[in-house]
Amino acid sequence: MKKKERIKLFGLIGRNIDYSFSRKYFSEKFKKNNLNDCVYLNYDLKEINDFNKIINKNPSLKGLNVTIPYKKTIIPFLDELSDEARAINAVNTIVFESSGRKIGHNTDYLGFNKALEEKYKSKPENALILGSGGASEAVKYVLNKIGCDFKIVSRHPDKNQIGYYQISKEIIKKTNLIVNTTPVGTYPKINEAPNIPYNYLDSEHLLFDLIYNPKETEFLKRGKANGCRITNGYKMLKYQAEKSWSLWSKKPKFH
């Protein structure tokens, strides 16, 4: 029993997350760094109201990552938000303090910003963000911060967004960054792609897909076929995961 109590438990909450990057990443890192008392598990929730059941059943929890579709709906279950999480209105990392308080953070924006910096010597001027869910919030935050104009594309656009059917040749030509924040194209539905006019794309465009499985989505393949630069979400995930660990452990990132 004492051995069990010493375990430091971490994990991921989301829906249909067997494919997840996080469990494999952290399990390998724990092993590499000889953190034998640390364990990372997946918690697949049918609905966000199951969150408290997970907490009550796992008193050893020290931290959680949060993925689709709960990055926004998790917020009412938390005691406090970091400034960034509050501004972004989405949480992807939870820290469990010794007092029992649950603090929500957003490390997605750091991951996206760092991955984007690697692709641009100077900032992009105009962008399209495909999707308006929780994953898009960190992207919006970064683009606002660096002064990049953008339009949000949604299947059900509000007054501040546009629909996919409204993406014209003119809009594409004014854009040099297109970010897919939707799950369209994720394994196993790898033949699907966001409905944009790919024939207007060229070498002036960077296509950034937050999806990392498959490595090259149909969205990226179509962009590549038209001469675009492309990148998937792996580096963003790696950078945000390292930041999550620094929050949980209050130590520098993994070696």
How should each PLM-predicted stretch be described?
Residues 2-119:
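Phosphate/diphosphate ligand-binding glycine-rich loop within oxidoreductases
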Residues 2-6, 122-123, 144, 196-205:
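Short, conserved loop/helix-junction motifs that constitute active-site signature segments
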Residues 114-115, 228-251, 255:
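Active-site capping/gating segments
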Residues 160-231, 235:
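Rossmann-like adenosine-cofactor binding region
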